[in-house]
Amino acid sequence: MFQVLDQLPADPILGLSAACRADTNPHKVDLTIGIYMDDSGVCPVFEAVRRAQQALDAEEVTKAYLPPAGDDVFNRGISELVLGRGSAALADGRVSSIQTPGGCGALRIGAEIIQAAAPGARVWVSDPTWPVHIPLLGSVGLQFESYRYYDPASHGVDFEGMVADLGRAAAGDVVLLHGCCHNPCGADLSPEQWAVVADMAERQGFT
């Protein structure tokens, strides 16, 4: 069965990390993968994280598995953290939250929902975007468009280009936006720019 499957290309970011590990330069700094490493190249467990784990272990009363949406208390807490406790959307019951196995798991579930609910929708992804986004979302048959995002000259957001490109997004399309610390460029929208994008979404009907 497996012999009919094509070998996937190597991940370019993980390949860079392997090349960095093989580099003998004593002054090298590995900035390829989004994790903190100490001077010896180890990703340590911070003391605050260790204590939090111990506190959770001490409070745990069951190993029963969670419902499909995950931990209700966690979902409510993360929704309040993102939207604010006074959010009208929360008060009106317009927010749904689920736990997923990481960001890629969230995107895969989102892709399946989009394909089931709006199979003709185009998904707009930033240029650049994290390399796994397009194959991950495309694996369910979604179609893509790109919008300008990073401006190498200013090392910031090409907001004029972004707005021009998203001006072509149709009602029912889906725009993949990075909430903070855009992956991979790190450039973020200002609150004023977020407001412009939100107005465009409402006016044009994209999600």
Model-derived regions: residue spans:
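N-terminal "arm"/small-domain region of PLP-dependent enzymes with the aminotransferase-like
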Residues: 1-70, 77-80, 84
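Conserved core of the PLP fold type I
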Residues: 55, 60-205
